[in-house]
Amino acid sequence: MKLQKLPVRLAVAATVGFLSIATNGPVHCPVRGAEPEAKPVPFEAGFGERDITPPAGLPMWGYGARHDMLSQGALDPLFAKAVVIHAGDDKLAIVGLDMGRGPTQPMMEKIRRALSEKAKIAHVMISGSHTHHGPVLELTDRKGFGKGKFDKAIAYTNRLPDLIVEAILDADRNAKPARVGINSRVDLNLNRNRQSKRPIKATDPMLAMMRFDDASTGKPIAVVVNFAAHPVMTNERILKYSADYPGFMKKHVESQLDTHCVFMQGASGDMSVNAGQYNGPQKFGEHLGDLVIELAKAAKTQVPPHPAIKGRVDHFLFHSRTDFSNPLVTALYSRAFFPELVRNFVAEFQDGVPVELNTILLNGDTALVGGSGEFFSNHSNRLKERAYVPHALFFGYCNGHSMYFPTIEAASEGGYGADAQVSPAEVGAGEQVMNRALVNLYTMLGKLRPSDDAPAAEHPRTASTSRP
């Protein structure tokens, strides 16, 4: 982003005895106390969406140079698109937003509470696409923090969590027996490293697709796309809302496959689009969509042999490299952005940099990891290399926004996204988050004991919630 950033080993086996006595034939003797054969766990999936396009007249998110300039309408609509997965009684919601960031912490609290009370959905991953043509979400109903001057924006952000919940509840109600298939490519050159000064620059080339089909008809229910690159192809001087290239990709996939498409942004902290001949958000989005369609058509879906959802949420509070209590610092930020936005930002970061990590193990073979910020691509690459599962996807801007997380070597290089101004968390914070995700996954896989997965003693401000 451009400156706006300121602003579950014990395996329990029921053994059924079979005793063959050499008389007139076999005699079947069930072992006393044996449990009955377990019923298959149902696997279901459903889709839901809501139009979340704001009204005109809200300050726009993404470029500090806009300051508090107000939007003048929309180039294309913004959506919240959700897939809800059932594995027996356990439920996971995967939500893609055409927003610059994930929901704020108060929004997430409201969303989680509603989903728990109304649908018993315990696992939630909501990622912003990181479009730089969405509304500012951080303003609050306090004098000097948005009240009075930006009441229209506050009214919208008060309504947004309800719209997201509605989309998720629709997906939950629409859930039906499903098959799932995952396909990906890593031989593409669709993104480029915009930060590194090294001759060989890191990228996360993976384009991944999860396809959910109706188990009885084979008709696609939805596809979930995971790709990493900043959606900044729309001219920053255009003060209108736009989903940028992810919006055109989704629309193209939906029209060609007659299904629904959810976009989940990856670790794009240092990733920009490598457009080549596909200049502009529509051309690039449709080209990306063509590649997604190829992956979807080639994917083989099946009912998972052992449907299961295991999840854990970790919260970190990292030391800040920037002193937000210094009035000179806040004054400089206010000049770069606008005062009301900066006051909300400082209030959130005054005790340190808060980070949320979501780790999901789906069906025992798919890792879904979500981090609340702009993680550099090598964080995702290294997680995928070290997680010995068939499929591993990383979702950025997930369930919040904690600014940039450069790798240690990137922080040593400096530059935008790596310097303290927009990546205030202590150096190495990203690595700590990814290590935590890896321990979570191996614990869920039964390869580490739960007693081994307590947060490290040197990070006493790390808290976690497990939802096996």
What are these regions (language model features)?
Residues 8-10, 32, 134-136:
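Alpha-helical and His/Cys-centered functional microenvironments
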Residues 18-39, 466-468:
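Bacterial Sec-dependent signal peptides at the C-terminal "C-region" and cleavage site
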Residues 1-27:
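Bacterial N-terminal signal peptides that target proteins for export
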Residues 289:
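Charged, flexible cofactor/metal-binding loops and thiol motifs
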Residues 35-260, 264-271, 277-286, 296, ...:
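Conserved beta-alpha junction segments in alpha/beta enzyme cores
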